[in-house]
Amino acid sequence: DCDVAVLFIETSGRLPMCGHGTIGTVTIAVENGLVRPREPGRLSLDTPAGRVDASFRQEGRFVEEVRLTNVPSYLHAEGLAARVDGLGEVVVDVAYGGNFYAIVEPQRAFRDMADHSAADLVTLGRRLRDALNAAHDFVHPERPGIG
């Protein structure tokens, strides 16, 4: 039912959805004639997370703009705690929007992003992800293969 199917593979593995990857896929596929959209200016993609619809604006041969309508998002969990080396206990909410995302509000263990370098944020983010995954199962309620 879609114009194209796509898998997102990166250094950490396979992703159910990737916004940047979708924009790049639409751009490359349209500009190089790899796919012919059923409807001008629109492309539907079958992703592991579900159907993603893209609209694009083309000037001549080049795609100048891509807009996405992603899979439905929702709040998956509230108030999950995880112990993170270098921070202590961090409390997060977890949202889903094609992937699971930890939402970290300012708190005792983590007051502000400005308190950390970009490299530290990457390290702490990985530690937080690992701690959350060790303590909790994140599985999509309608697509159990996503987790």
Regions found by a protein language model. Give the residues of each.
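Active-site proximal loop and beta-alpha junction motif in alpha/beta enzyme cores
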Residues: 1-17, 22-147
